[in-house]
């Protein structure tokens, strides 16, 4: 295991309930330090969710140009075991009057940890706030009907890709990736990484 990180780079906002210390090879800390060395200041937070590939502290980070005034550690899955790869958590941060949640959701057809149950937990927690953005890997294809993407739409959230005045083809996966290799369309292009807003925000571009 990597040694613990000494002093966290400037702008770090600890997430409540995070019991896993930052290590010297933490990627979010490396990005924060690189930006700091270039004279670009960001506020940031990091939340580990589980051990990935048996060696990594796999989690989520949010970087903000505005000061972070609050952070939230939300368990989305029924599983709450740091050594179990099906454990799902989301990191929420408040910057200004807006909350941002970065996510890595389970799959729609997972019998043990289905997307729908995780979405219900996330939607209730995030929906209680005024203006919210949900961003990250939803593991739900935007082009597939009747699954996770449509559930989010029916819940009243706005897809910022659709709201954008200018946008590219939208695909965030262009080849087979872990977690999708056994799917019939494993090599097909997909838009599983998305940004949703609790209201119809003005979006200039999505790319």
Give, region by region, the residue ranges found by the protein language model.
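Acidic helix-start/capping segments at beta-turn-to-alpha-helix junctions
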Residues: 1-6, 49-51
């Amino acid at each position: 295991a990597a040694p613990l990180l000494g002093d966290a780079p400037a702008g770090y906002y600890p997430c409540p309930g995070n019991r896993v210390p930052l290590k010297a090879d933490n990627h979010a800390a490396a990005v924060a330090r690189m930006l700091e060395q270039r004279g670009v200041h960001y506020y940031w937070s990091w939340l580990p969710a589980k051990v990935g590939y048996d060696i990594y502290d796999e989690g989520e980070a949010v970087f903000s140009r505005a000061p972070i005034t609050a952070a939230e550690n939300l368990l989305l899955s029924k599983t709450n075991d740091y050594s179990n790869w099906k454990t799902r958590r989301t990191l929420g941060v408040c910057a200004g009057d807006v909350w941002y949640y970065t996510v890595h959701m389970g799959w729609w057809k997972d019998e043990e940890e289905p997307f729908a149950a995780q979405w219900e937990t996330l939607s209730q927690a995030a929906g209680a706030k005024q203006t919210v953005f949900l961003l990250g890997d939803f593991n739900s294809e935007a082009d597939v009907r009747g699954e996770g993407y449509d559930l989010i739409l029916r819940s009243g959230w706005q897809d910022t890709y659709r709201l954008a005045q200018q946008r590219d083809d939208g695909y965030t996966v262009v080849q087979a990736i872990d977690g999708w290799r056994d799917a019939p369309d494993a090599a097909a292009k997909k838009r599983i990484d998305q940004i949703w807003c609790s209201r119809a925000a003005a979006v200039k571009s999505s790319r």
